[in-house]
Amino acid sequence: MLGSPLREYELLVSLGSEFEPEAESRVRSLFTPVEPEGVTVKHLDVLGIRKFAYEIKGRNDGVCVVVRFLANAGSIAEIGRQMRLTEDVIRTKLLRVGRK
């Protein structure tokens, strides 16, 4: 869907707490395969280590990173695939910004 319009999305990514020093570079690398499709990272914020409300994949805490980016609808599936294939990623939550 290269012809579809770019929309703004916000993604919360939780990584293992052992990846705190390189969290930003690890998350940026997940977007590298989709950059040729027009995906642009606008803002990336590392929130640090956060305690989870419940155990996820055997972990009680992780590094949380929030990413705001522009992408077309076709690129979202590939971003999700990249997240699922990366063992460092514990959990993700994707939201379309401005949608009511």
UniProtKB/Swiss-Prot annotation:
SUPFAM superfamilies: Ribosomal protein S6 (SSF54995). It comes from the Bacteria. Gene3D superfamilies: 3.30.70.60. One of its GO terms (biological process) is translation. GO terms for cellular component: ribonucleoprotein complex; ribosome. The keyword Amino-acid biosynthesis does not apply. Keywords: Ribonucleoprotein, Ribosomal protein, RNA-binding, rRNA-binding. The keyword Nucleotide-binding does not apply. Pfam families: Ribosomal_S6. GO terms for molecular function: rRNA binding; structural constituent of ribosome. Belongs to the bacterial ribosomal protein bS6 family. Binds together with bS18 to 16S ribosomal RNA. This is Small ribosomal subunit protein bS6. It comes from Tropheryma whipplei (strain Twist).
